[in-house]
């Protein structure tokens, strides 16, 4: 938390500079934080891109993980219209309007930057994970935001519930429903 506060104090918000520096369009931003490990990126990024691409009034900006080579992303990006930026995750969050975020510390960082988000986490053994979550595991949430609040502040689409349609519905709800968006932000 201190790291985010220090960043915000040292880097006043300047969207025009961020757009120019990264050759972005002057459009609202859907930030994509697809994880920091190759398997997470492989499992999550393709559907995140499909879901976010349904919003043509927004531009897609992907936070590249520092330990992942730019070439690795190319196999999953395909023809999607997305800009990949590295070493600027906090700047991206500072200027994002909404985010799709793979579960992990990034969910808490996204909340600290007050960006409405959908938490996404797919696993190839989704049905098994869903069964375990419903019948065996006692942890109700996977995102740090919800775990800390001990209630659902942000929607978690995990395993078999992480579908393109569900992500699109949740993004649409955040974008179009101001009361829903504000309720999420007040939960931060």
Regions found by a protein language model. Name each.
Residues 1-188:
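Nucleotide-activated sugar donor-binding and catalytic core shared by glycosyltransferases
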